Amino acid sequence: AEAYAAVPRIGRRTRLGPKQRESAWAVFAFVRERLSTRGVVTTADIYGRLTRWVEDGGQLPFTHVVVDEAQDLSVAQARFLAAVGRAGTADALFFTGDLGQRIFHLPFSWAKLGLDVRGRAQVLKVCYRTSHQIRRAADRLLAGEIADQDGIEESRRGTVSVFDGPDPVVELFDDASLETVGVGKW
């Protein structure tokens, strides 16, 4: 509980006070106990076990890893990949990702977990998956410069798409059934 209370929480929007952290820890402890009683583990637990196995000299059945959509990695997955990278050659890991597409996890420092890509990252400026119209609409919603927790910045300026499509339509509906009808008409 004390270790949990002392962990810095970079990127969190609302900070928890000591009493709130204590309450949260009680919930986590309860869930952990329930999982243990049922013989169930979380995905994070699996990655933690794999990380320890690699760090203890476990022999990997591969020499290189390519990670797509790297912006969606969890902390446990990033720790595992850092262990894989330390166990392999200098070029054992290759990541592709888009900071502007991070939607699943709160930001965290890759460098603090052992994945320091500063100075070795390349920003690609040609988009093959999204039309000009959708990309421009999305760019209006994002800041011109996006930075991660390690200070790596990615500029949206100069990015181009290779095809056109219809303009995105934004509509508001009063309820889910009207939204379903609206989507069906599209």
Tell where the protein language model's regions lie, with residue ranges:
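ATP-hydrolysis module of ASCE/P-loop NTPase motor domains
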Residues: 1-20
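Short coil/turn segments at secondary-structure boundaries
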Residues: 2-8, 40-48
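Conserved helicase motor core of SF1/SF2 NTP-dependent helicases
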Residues: 20, 26-40, 51-186
